[in-house]
Amino acid sequence: MNQPKKSDSLMTFWDHLEALRGVILKILAVAMAGFIIAFCFKEPLFKLILAPSSPDFILYKWISTFGDFNVDMFSTTLTAQFMIHMKMAFYFSLVVIMPYTLYLLFGFISPALYQNERRSTTKVVVWSYILFMTGIILDYLIIFPLAFRFLGTYQVSPTIPNVITLESYTDLLITLTLLMGILFELPILAWFLGKLGVIDKAFMKKYRRHAIVVILIIAAIITPTTDIFTLTIVTLPIYLLYELSISIVK
């Protein structure tokens, strides 16, 4: 069996702590640089962030049955726009530097792993990142625009106009983005639970119908609409994730 590197076994607790400190400082430095760059490029950053609020967004062009709609956004407090600018620059920088962060963290723990563990961990880290980013992209292109269009134009009475704040828009964007990113980690979670012996392929197949009901409920919560087409668009990717999870669980 392959053993961990000898140099790692000779390191003291304080050596490990110093190495971890170096990794954290590098991550913080890159995060700060990413934040400053994102903050300085305000116009392209918010052009990207606000694109789903425009009737010309790519999804609305694909699905012509949506028709035209217009949602005006407002800022209601003196500091709101500046604070939102900082917040979105911070979150954007976190997403951008994620590969480098994972690379540094893996470099820190890999010397303590056996060679076969190192290969397995590399695959898990890479696929976790790919799935998380896939969830983010799907949310930006499909899930969030559908939710925004429905909630932004929904009225209990024609006499009550919607006044959408920039803060509520960005909060929903962040929430759904994080939710979809985590949701797309389902295959990784299933693989891990399978390794622990908690679930297996037969278990997931047996409860497939129950899972479909749960998936429909989750999709309905994410996009609260009575439109069957929209519900299907949201449900299908999540269901495919479940089927993918079945295929990788032994």
Which sequence ranges carry the predicted segments?
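Membrane topogenic/interface segments and analogous intrinsically disordered interaction regions
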Residues: M1-K250
